[in-house]
Amino acid sequence: MNPIPQLEDLGDLTGRRVLVRTDFNVPLDGGAIVDDLRIKAALPTIKWLVDKGALVTCASHLGRPKGAPDPAFSMEPVRDLLSKLAPGVELLENLRFNPGETSNDPAFVAELVAGFDAYVNDAFGASHRSHASIVGPPKHLPSAAGRLLAREVEILGGLRSNAKRPFIAILGGAKVSDKIGVIEALLDSVDAIIIGGGMAYTFLAAQGHHVGSSLLESDMIDTAKRLLDSDATIHVPHDNSALGPGGKIGDPSAGGEVRQVG
């Protein structure tokens, strides 16, 4: 695997403005952060840059707003926590409030990089997307991988090149969109992939199963179908039932939240 530029490759950062693409897509409940792991995971990169004298501005998406400002997806709760964890570090508003983010609009890229001297990508979970904040800045600014992204790439590279057989990957999590980069990176290297967690329901829906009111990424069903139709061996849960009214177990096709059994 070709080495990717590291933070050290950016040279002297004293007084330089650095745009850091982070993955602060954290779960919220009533405007409160439920799990701050992703924010804390970005701190090694942020603090390294600050220690080197850089002026750091972070940028991230949060949820799936429809290309316009939506208070439900504001970065304000994240900004409040980040100000405590890394004082002086700025955070842009939700990138997806601008339709140019998901369409990779060159005009939005130009707006995004204006005034910055360097770019760091530390958003591994979003790096498979051809979005403006991911693929645009490296065309205009000296760029490097953050500590988190570099570590993920190193681990994946090691798994793919030094795997012992049989090599079976077990992947979970809530969203296919968060794991698609890992899945696609492993497809040609593993003997099988076992899908669990909430994202399994998107794969089940791709197979034509009813998933009731369970977590479902409708816009990822076609992607799940493509993966299932590939030459890779992918296993998804088959022992499912649904919780009906009053918590009773029923037929998944009748609705309710589907649960994996066993």
Briefly describe each language-model feature range.
Residues M1-G262:
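Active-site loop-to-helix "anion-binding N-cap" substructures in soluble metabolic enzymes
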